Amino acid sequence: MSPAPSAMRVRVLGSSAGGGLPQWNCGCPQCVRARAGGLAPRRQPSLALSADGVRWSLVNASPDVRDQLARFPALHPRPGTRDLPLDTVVLTNADLDHVLGLLVLREALPHRIVSTPWVRDALLEHAAPWRLLAPAWGAAKLDQPVALDREGHLEARLFPVPGKVPGWLSGLASNHPETTTALRVTDARTGRRLVYAPGVARLDDGTLAELAAADLCFFDGTFFAADELTRTRPGAPDAHAMGHAPIAESLPRLAELARPVSSGGRRVLYIHVNNTNPVLDPGSPEASVVRRAGLEIAMDGQELAL
């Protein structure tokens, strides 16, 4: 069934965490299976949003953006032009898997780039290549409304979530409420709302309230267990130190939000899933736990409508 003309359209461009699946330097069970064709490959995290299915905006710009755009005909330029139907790129933080794609887009800057002042200043002050993007880059304060599309149908607001300074900025910048954000997008025509929160250090009451007020939620699914990466690579930091709430901890609270779509309920999907996370295998016990709780694992190429 085609979306209603007034529906917000959502395309999952990438559902993996940084490095994708398979990750080039990893021999974990999921990466081995993905190389052998046993698991679908996944690209690094990003969403595309549209008010009309014609012009689009991106939530974060992953290093895989060139491939992601190529795989989505709606974001192809019209024949004979370089007019990409892209209005806005919104950044939720300064993690490299969320911003490196901006440098790929530099040759055809979108209508605008939007982030918090902290994210904009950190990138422009400490990473010279991003200065090429300064003319298109606007800063939005927390909870400041920003129209994603030219007609103003989709209103975006960034709100703070628990997080940390990206590793590449360690020692260069201090943590601030604007450092790590999630995105709330409301369709002014219908009142329906999406929340995208790919990096959350812990599921606090404020973040949970934002999710509870949304009709479609994407939440940090980086790791299933806090010690997951440590078991794969001894000496590695745990999930909390990396700024990610493990699924094992967030699932009980998120399960209270998920309701069957058939009854007008709320869909809750995990995204930003690390290659080490066993939920990438649909047959794993961990994936079964997520499904039984009424939640989903986002998939590359998945399309939804609100």
PLM regions and their residue ranges:
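Extreme N-terminal starter segment of soluble prokaryotic enzymes
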Residues: 5-11
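Cap/insert and terminal regions of metallo-dependent hydrolase folds
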Residues: 180, 191-193, 201-301
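Metallo-beta-lactamase
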Residues: 3, 116-181, 293-304
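Active-site-proximal loop/helix segment associated with metal-binding centers of metalloenzymes
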Residues: 19-44, 144-239
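Active-site neighborhood of phospho(di)ester-bond hydrolases with catalytic His/Asp-centered motifs
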Residues: 58-62, 85-97, 115-116, 195-200, ...
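Short, well-ordered beta-strand micro-motif
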Residues: 48-50, 184-186, 303-305
